[in-house]
């Protein structure tokens, strides 16, 4: 049997959570999810694609990456819901990655809510795949649902 102090502490934690303080929200989960996918999942999928063709020339790798970005349906590689290649400069691609998630929670503060988020990155495919986080311009934010 737990003591009264334990019950008070647990009740306080539950009340704080229902009040929204200290609890993860669907928006923060979506932000973290898209960032992780932008930093790890997409580079891994792109690296796997480029390596499967045995390409070593930076120009060949960039052309293959351009084709991959254009022809790949993002959910098919389980990366994000959609992406937009904003620009290409040589072997560098400026890409916006978008994610929309719905809360599975039946409890406040996220009950039945959904959120969208965007992560903006530059991927350099010259040798391997490197990732650079960049600020999202207004045009990227305008594309959020």
Regions flagged by a language model, labelled:
Residues 27-40:
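Short, low-complexity, disordered segments immediately C-terminal to signal peptides
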Residues 38-65:
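N-terminal alpha-helical signal peptides/signal-anchor transmembrane segments
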Residues 1-10:
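Bacterial N-terminal signal peptides that target proteins for export
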Residues 63-80:
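Conserved non-transmembrane functional hotspots
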């Amino acid at each position: 049997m737990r003591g009264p102090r334990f019950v008070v502490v647990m009740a306080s934690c539950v009340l704080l959570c229902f009040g929204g303080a200290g609890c993860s929200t669907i928006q923060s989960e979506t932000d973290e999810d898209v960032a992780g996918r932008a930093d790890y999942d997409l580079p891994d999928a792109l690296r796997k694609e480029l390596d499967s063709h045995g390409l070593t020339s930076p120009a060949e790798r960039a052309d293959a990456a351009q084709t991959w970005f254009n022809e790949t349906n993002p959910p098919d590689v389980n990366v994000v819901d959609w992406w937009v290649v904003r620009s290409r400069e040589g072997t560098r691609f400026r890409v916006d990655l978008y994610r929309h998630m719905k809360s599975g929670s039946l409890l406040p503060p996220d009950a039945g809510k959904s959120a969208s988020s965007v992560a903006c990155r530059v991927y350099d495919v010259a040798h391997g795949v490197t990732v650079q986080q960049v600020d999202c311009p207004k045009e990227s934010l305008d594309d959020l649902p």
